[in-house]
Amino acid sequence: MKFNRVWVFDLDNTLHNATPHIFPSINTAMNAYLQTHLGLDEAGAGDLRRHYWQRYGATLIGLMRNYATDPRHFLQATHDFPTLEKIVLREPGLRLTLRRLPGRKIVFSNA
């Protein structure tokens, strides 16, 4: 039996540096969501996000468990990037490196 190689890559902070643009946008949007939907001030939103990150590993999980937050609504409000191609920074040499890998390549992002 012949197996075809499949490479699966995470986009953010693996294939590109998400720190300068993507993550700050998500952080701002999540804080705004918590302020709007839970009536928190900015400090309270940040504190709750840190608490949920430490306890559940993600803000969304904490919101779902404690507030029955609809995950689709939360993600649409906090992870909307209409100009994504402008904020994903190219990594020099990455295209050539990926082309050298035999098989199918799949890129995903949990953001």
State where each predicted segment sits.
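N-terminal helical cap/lid subdomain that shapes the substrate entry/recognition surface
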Residues: K2-F9, T14-P92, R100-G103
